[in-house]
């Protein structure tokens, strides 16, 4: 099994853009991937405002991010998820405030953007016919796989539950209670 995360995709996307300074609302893996890609993390005149997952978001971060975006920094989101397990605010919720204040929408690199699927397949030198996408969110993970023609696995240990499937026009290829129980990979 090979994994390609939204943090990896964000760094790969940004390597192809002009500018190497970023104001980051995020933690761990995202910051690590950005450093590996040669970015400087700063709150002085950044080229990008990058929003990922964090549990330490505060008003000062929102103010800085919105100010930088309103003044020309390119606004990037790792994903559009509004909340995660336990209903904690996620990237999409954090971006909503920045968007309202700055008047600019983020470019979403992660699922359901087709960009992450193409980048993942290229990075892994894989083909859609032999690739499975695993996720806990019908609106992002499973939608991305469906749109890319991939087999999909919905795990019920996160955002989406069995009842949610009936609300969508598409269906996952397989459904498992958790990642630990997947036996097709």
Feature names for model-found ranges:
Residues 1-185:
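Asp-based, Mg2+/Mn2+-dependent phosphohydrolase catalytic module
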